[in-house]
């Protein structure tokens, strides 16, 4: 596990280069938000020690308790790119552990129970630390099994997201129709007939119709 860059240090007298770096706000629950990436100037030697590599599993030090410790895999979207010290970068041994498998483990009920139990809670937020992240026990099936599980979860989650998107569009359409219908009725553009009222009554649940 690699710690990140501590902000506010002075590098006076040293040659510096501008690098983008990830903040806690960039690491979301299961994905990265790279719409607003900040940059800063540090010496190349300092940057080398906190530079992200594809396959690093990113975890935030603090946030909502139910999202604490959830891993997001860095795919090299920006190169080079550094990370702040409040963002942990876990680098897996490729012959033992797949990054995406680790990310799914941290998002599982097993992972959630661990980080919720070990997280330090404050009024609105919770926090973990490098020691607790390092102590997280990771089940290690053979790499072939890890790969199979990752492929299965990727497929199923992708399918569920597609269904969710379709339902979301349907809800948007129905919401727009509802607003249009209300507008037409209250402005007199649509006349309500006895048949319309009878149809509404027929669709009401029995308990409501009898109330």
Residue spans of the language-model regions?
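Sequence-specific dsDNA recognition surfaces
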Residues: 1-11, 20, 25-57, 203-206
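A short glycine-rich beta-alpha junction/loop motif
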Residues: 7, 80-88, 120-147
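Short, solvent-exposed loop/turn positions at domain surfaces
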Residues: 8, 46, 122, 159, ...
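A short beta-sheet element
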Residues: 23-24, 48-107, 125-129
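Hydrophobic residues in beta-strands and at strand termini
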Residues: 24, 42, 92, 138-140
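Active-site/binding-pocket entry motifs
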Residues: 27-28, 65, 112
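A structural connector/turn signal
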Residues: 40-41, 46-47, 77, 123, ...
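Amphipathic alpha-helical coiled-coil/heptad-repeat segments
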Residues: 113, 139-211
């Amino acid at each position: 596990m690699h710690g990140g860059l501590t902000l506010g240090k002075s590098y006076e007298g040293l040659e510096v280069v501008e690098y983008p770096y990830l903040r806690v706000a960039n690491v979301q629950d299961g994905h990265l938000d790279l719409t607003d990436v900040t940059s800063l100037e540090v010496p190349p030697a300092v940057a080398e020690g906190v530079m992200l590599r594809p396959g690093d599993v990113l975890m935030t030090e603090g946030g909502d308790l139910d999202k604490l410790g959830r891993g997001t895999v860095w795919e090299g979207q920006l190169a080079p790119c550094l990370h702040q010290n409040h963002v942990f970068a876990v680098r897996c041994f490729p012959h033992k552990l797949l990054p995406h498998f680790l990310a799914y483990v941290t998002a599982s009920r097993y992972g959630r129970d661990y980080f919720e139990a070990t997280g330090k809670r404050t009024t609105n937020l919770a926090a973990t630390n490098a020691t607790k992240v390092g102590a997280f026990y990771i089940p290690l099936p053979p790499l072939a099994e890890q790969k199979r599980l990752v492929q299965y979860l990727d497929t199923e989650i992708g399918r569920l997201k597609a269904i969710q998107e379709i339902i979301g569009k349907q809800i948007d359409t129905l919401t727009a129709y509802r607003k249009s219908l209300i507008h037409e009725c209250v402005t007199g553009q649509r006349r309500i007939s006895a048949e319309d009222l009878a149809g509404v009554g027929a669709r009401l649940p029995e308990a409501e119709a009898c109330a």
